[in-house]
C-alpha cells in the first residue's frame, strides 16, 4: 500500500492511533526529500499541539537515528563504556568541557555531539571554536580515532549523523514549533543514539535562564527523555538543575574555556559548577558500570581532577582536533582577549535577591558573543566574568560583574543590561539547591 505523508499527518492532527512503521516511513521520506517542507511543517505543528504517545516518540527517535550513519564502537577495541551527557542549555553552562575529560579519565569514552548557541543560551561548539585551530567538524573516522586515543571528542553534528533530524529542526526553527516536547526528545536522543552512546546523563535546566518556560515543562521534558531513551535501548537518567543564575560565574566563549581550564587544573572550582558537574559525571560512571554507586563515582572523579588526569585528557583532545598542544598550560597565549573591560557597579547596597539569567545571556549576545540569528559571526573574546551570585551581600558601587567588550561603548551598554538583570533587596533570599531532582 502506498504511503501518503498527508494521511500520516492527518492521523497526527486528529490524534488517531499511529502505526510505528508509518512513523519510520515518514522519516525515510524526509531524508529522501519525498516529504516536502510544507508537510514537515504541518507534521511539526500537529505534534506541537497534540504531542505523540510514547510508542510514537520512540519510533520517531529510532527512525531519525537510522536516517544516517550509526556509529558502532564494538570494533574500536575500547576497554570501557561509551557514555555521554547533554544539557538543555543555559548561561555559563560549561559542564561539557569539564565532565567529558573527568569521565574519560575514569575509563569512559565520550563521543559528545554538541550544538551552537541560539538566543540567550551559549553553545558548546562556539566555546570550542574560541580555541585556535580546533576542528569542530571532523570526519567520522577522525572522530573515532580521537575518542579511542583521548577518551573523548566534543564535536558538532556531521552531515552523516541523523540527517532527518537536521532537516526537521530547520523547519521547526522557522515555524514556531521548537518547543514541542516530543520533537525535542527525538532530536536530542536520535543524535546520541547515532553516536553509539550506551548511557546518557541528561541535564534539564529550570529557572529564568532555562530553555523551557516553566518548572513543570522542564520536568515533563526530563520524563519524556528518560522514558524514550530507555525505550530506545540507551540507559538514560535526567537531573533537574537550577538556572536562576549563571551556572559558572562567567558567560562568553573564550572566557568559559578559561574557566573550564581553571576548573580542571584546580585554579578555581566554583561551587555551583562543581555540584552539577559531579552529579552528572557520577551518573555517567554508575550507568556505565565504572563505579559501584554515587559515592564511589565521586571519589573516582575527585581523584581524576586532583591527579591532573582530567586536565590531561582535555589537552589531548584539543591537540588531536588541531588546537594548541599547550592550551592548558598557557591559555592566555592562545585564547582571544577583549579590548575593553569594565566593572558593573551595584546601584545600591543590599542582598542579591533575583537574577534574570536570560538577560545576562542576551547581554553576551548584544556584545557579539552569541547569535541573534543563524549565520551571525561571533566575537569569541567578549562576555562577562566575576558574576555575583544570588544571596550575596553587596555594597553600593561594588562590582556585580566585569564586562569584556570590543570597545567602551558596547561595554557601557552591556553594563546597563547586566545591572538591570540584578535585583537587590533589603533581606537575603531563601537558599535554593542547584540540583533539584533526579528522574530515572
Curated annotation (Swiss-Prot):
Pfam families documented for this protein: Glycos_trans_3N, Glycos_transf_3, PYNP_C
Domain of life: Bacteria
Any GO CC annotation of this UniProt entry: cytosol
SUPFAM superfamilies: Nucleoside phosphorylase/phosphoribosyltransferase catalytic domain (SSF52418), Nucleoside phosphorylase/phosphoribosyltransferase N-terminal domain (SSF47648), Pyrimidine nucleoside phosphorylase C-terminal domain (SSF54680)
Keyword match Glycosyltransferase: yes
Keyword RNA-binding included in the entry's annotation: no
UniProt pathway annotation: Pyrimidine metabolism; dTMP biosynthesis via salvage pathway; dTMP from thymine: step 1/2
Reaction equation(s) it catalyzes: thymidine + phosphate = 2-deoxy-alpha-D-ribose 1-phosphate + thymine
Any one Gene Ontology molecular-function term assigned to this protein's record: 1,4-alpha-oligoglucan phosphorylase activity
Keywords: Glycosyltransferase, Transferase
EC number, UniProt record: 2.4.2.4
InterPro entries: Glycosyl_Trfase_fam3, Glycosyl_Trfase_fam3_N_dom, Glycosyl_Trfase_fam3_N_dom_sf, Nuc_phospho_transferase, PYNP-like_C_sf, PYNP_C, Pyrmidine_PPas_bac/euk, Pyrmidine_PPase_CS
GO biological process: pyrimidine nucleobase metabolic process; thymidine metabolic process
Known role: The enzymes which catalyze the reversible phosphorolysis of pyrimidine nucleosides are involved in the degradation of these compounds and in their utilization as carbon and energy sources, or in the rescue of pyrimidine bases for nucleotide synthesis.
Assembly with partners or alone: Homodimer.
Sequence similarity: Belongs to the thymidine/pyrimidine-nucleoside phosphorylase family.
Classification via NCBIfam families: PRK05820.1, T_phosphoryl, Y_phosphoryl
The name this protein goes by in its record: Thymidine phosphorylase
Organism, as annotated: Burkholderia pseudomallei (strain 668)
Gene name of the encoded protein: deoA
Amino acid at each position: 500500500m502506498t504511503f501518503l505523508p498527508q494521511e500520516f499527518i492527518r492521523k497526527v492532527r486528529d490524534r488517531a492511533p499511529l502505526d510505528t512503521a508509518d512513523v519510520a516511513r515518514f522519516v525515510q521520506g524526509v531524508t529522501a526529500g519525498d516529504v516536502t517542507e510544507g508537510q514537515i511543517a504541518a507534521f511539526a505543528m500537529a505534534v506541537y499541539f497534540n504531542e505523540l504517545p510514547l510508542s510514537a516518540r520512540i519510533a520517531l527517535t529510532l527512525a531519525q537515528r537510522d536516517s544516517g550513519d550509526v556509529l558502532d564502537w564494538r570494533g574500536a577495541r575500547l576497554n570501557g563504556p561509551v557514555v555521554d551527557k547533554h544539557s538543555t542549555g543555559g548561561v555559563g553552562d560549561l559542564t561539557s568541557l569539564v565532565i567529558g575529560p573527568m569521565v574519560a579519565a575514569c575509563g569512559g569514552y565520550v563521543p559528545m555531539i554538541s550544538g551552537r548557541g541560539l538566543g540567550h543560551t551559549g553553545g558548546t561548539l562556539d566555546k570550542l571554536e574560541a580555541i585556535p585551530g580546533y576542528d569542530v567538524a571532523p570526519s567520522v573516522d577522525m572522530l573515532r580515532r580521537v575518542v579511542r586515543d583521548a577518551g573523548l571528542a566534543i564535536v558538532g553534528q556531521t552531515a552523516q549523523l541523523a540527517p532527518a533530524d537536521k532537516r526537521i529542526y530547520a523547519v521547526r526553527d522557522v515555524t514556531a514549533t521548537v518547543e514541542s516536547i516530543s520533537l525535542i526528545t527525538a532530536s536530542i536522543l536520535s543524535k546520541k543514539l547515532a553516536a553509539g552512546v550506551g548511557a546518557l546523563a541528561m541535564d534539564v535546566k529550570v529557572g529564568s535562564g532555562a530553555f523551557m518556560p516553566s518548572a513543570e515543562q522542564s520536568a515533563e521534558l526530563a520524563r519524556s527523555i528518560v522514558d524514550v531513551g530507555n525505550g530506545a535501548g540507551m540507559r538514560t537518567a535526567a537531573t533537574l538543575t537550577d538556572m536562576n543564575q549563571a551556572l559558572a560565574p562567567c558567560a562568553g566563549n573564550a572566557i568559559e574555556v578559561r574557566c573550564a581550564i581553571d576548573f580542571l587544573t584546580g585554579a578555581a572550582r566554583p561551587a555551583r559548577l562543581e555540584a552539577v558537574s559531579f552529579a552528572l559525571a557520577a551518573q555517567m560512571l554508575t550507568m556505565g558500570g565504572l563505579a559501584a554507586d554515587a559515592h564511589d563515582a565521586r571519589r573516582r572523579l575527585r581523584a581524576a581532577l586532583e591527579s591532573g588526569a582530567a586536565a590531561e585528557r582535555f589537552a589531548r583532545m584539543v591537540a588531536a582536533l588541531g588546537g594548541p598542544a599547550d592550551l592548558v598550560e598557557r591559555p592566555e597565549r592562545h585564547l582571544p582577549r577583549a579590548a575593553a573591560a569594565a566593572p558593573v557597579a551595584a546601584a545600591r547596597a543590599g542582598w542579591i535577591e533575583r537574577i534574570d539569567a536570560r538577560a545576562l545571556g542576551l547581554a553576551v549576545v548584544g556584545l557579539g558573543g552569541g547569535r541573534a540569528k543563524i549565520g551571525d559571526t561571533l566575537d569569541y573574546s567578549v562576555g562577562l566574568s566575576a558574576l555575583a551570585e544570588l544571596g550575596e551581600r553587596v555594597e553600593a558601587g561594588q562590582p556585580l560583574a566585569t564586562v569584556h567588550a570590543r570597545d567602551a561603548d558596547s561595554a557601557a551598554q552591556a553594563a546597563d543590561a547586566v545591572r538591570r538583570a540584578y535585583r537587590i533587596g533589603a533581606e537575603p533570599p531563601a537558599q535554593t539547591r542547584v540540583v533539584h531532582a533526579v528522574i530515572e
